[in-house]
Amino acid sequence: MNEHDSSIIENILKKTNLYIITKKPEISDILILNTCSIREKAQEKLFHQLGRWKKLKQKNSKILIAVGGCVAVQEGKKIYKRAKFIDIIFGPQTLHKLPKLLIESNKKKSLIINIKKKSLKKFNYTINKNTNIKKKFSSFVTIMEGCNKYCSFCIVPYTRGKEVSRNNKKIISEIIELSKKGVREITLLGQNVNAYKFSDTFNKKNYSFSDLLYSISEIPRIDRIRFITSHPVEFNNNIIEAYKKIPKLTNFLHLPVQSGSNKILKLMKRGYTIEKYENIVNKIKKIRPKINISSDFIIGFPGETKEDFQKTIYFISKINFDTSYSFIYSKRPRTRASKLEDNVTMEEKKKRLYKVQQKINQQAFQWKRRSTEQIVLVEGISKNNIQELYGRTENNRTVFFEGNPKFIGNFIKLKIISIKYNTFLKGKIISNNYF
């Protein structure tokens, strides 16, 4: 989400025709930091970066420094107390106001804070027919923001606000424009995409997430549809049925389970059991036997015993996850879990995290050995070897292979011939036919 928000910020500033985007802080007049508050480590990175920028501002007092994102909402004026040289604090829902905030900051010469939540106005600045985008063939499209789940470990409802869904027609319009600009693959974004629900008062119809998937599947030249992030509670039969009826939905699903222990899931306030999660996966695998399932895991959650952890390891094997985002539990302010006794030592947390990552890497290795033929969306020329192209498989694996640059932006069939660093794949073109 933050990566996509950063691209929206870039589009907003470009539209003013007042700014040239650069990645070199030393030549910049304005420095913007878009932050994440999911984990404490990410939050501390903010202040490390601000420390580096402070030196630039000491050399040039006219530089404006703006801090946005979820940490901006979470901490507000507290950021200024630790870094009194910053000029603007803005939230994820107010990033569309940034041009005005920059002008105001130049006039006032004092701290400006604008972190109001529950607004979708920033999406007025997404892709349209007049937008120039870099040549790319896969793109993100946000369909909703916020979350109503209030999991005990998660700060998102406090920083992004409650669930708000975009107008389905505006989403479709944005994707149509992306397809006209060469995009072949769409990833739908939201803190809980399954909760998407838009009420069209004019037509007196409610649009669900599955309704949206069917509408997107009808757009020409959009050949792959992905989505993140899903919540098991709202992963209903209509969404499962969509996997049967929409071939464009990739054989890849990111469905966070967080733990393999029902006791821990209850403490996390996740609202489902391991049995319910497994039932969802089994239904999908019955429709799509070759689908790859990815998950999130929080390791060392307060109260997690060795037995709870072993249940997680067992569940990883049972579902056969081949990708995960696994992290050590990070206490976040205002959350219910922050009041629980954190009784797992850091040394033990690190050991458990290593075991989870090793287990999933082993399963990923087995998938790579089995999956000899893949259809790949070719995205460009390798930075490390200009003789090679690179692309991504349905389950989001990067593949490098020798081929003609004319394949870029198209799909081609490859044979996987080797594994590179247990992350990247090496491929060989089966046929020069592309589509």
From Swiss-Prot:
Chief place of localization: cytoplasm
Free-text remark on how the cofactor is bound: Binds 1 [4Fe-4S] cluster, which is coordinated with 3 cysteines and an exchangeable S-adenosyl-L-methionine.
Swiss-Prot/TrEMBL cofactor(s): [4Fe-4S] cluster
MF GO annotations: 4 iron, 4 sulfur cluster binding; metal ion binding; N6-isopentenyladenosine methylthiotransferase activity
InterPro entries: Elp3/MiaA/NifB-like_rSAM, Methylthiotransferase, Methylthiotransferase_CS, Methylthiotransferase_N, Methylthiotransferase_N_sf, rSAM, TRAM_dom
Residue span, TRAM domain: 367-431
EC number: 2.8.4.3
Keywords: 4Fe-4S, Cytoplasm, Iron, Iron-sulfur, Metal-binding, S-adenosyl-L-methionine, Transferase, tRNA processing
Pfam families for this protein: Radical_SAM, TRAM, UPF0004
List of residues binding [4Fe-4S] cluster: 147, 151, 154
Domain Radical SAM core: 133-366
Protein name: tRNA-2-methylthio-N(6)-dimethylallyladenosine synthase
CC per GO annotation: cytosol
Function as written in the Swiss-Prot or TrEMBL entry: Catalyzes the methylthiolation of N6-(dimethylallyl)adenosine (i(6)A), leading to the formation of 2-methylthio-N6-(dimethylallyl)adenosine (ms(2)i(6)A) at position 37 in tRNAs that read codons beginning with uridine.
Subcellular location per the Swiss-Prot or TrEMBL entry: Cytoplasm
Catalytic activity: N(6)-dimethylallyladenosine(37) in tRNA + (sulfur carrier)-SH + AH2 + 2 S-adenosyl-L-methionine = 2-methylsulfanyl-N(6)-dimethylallyladenosine(37) in tRNA + (sulfur carrier)-H + 5'-deoxyadenosine + L-methionine + A + S-adenosyl-L-homocysteine + 2 H(+)
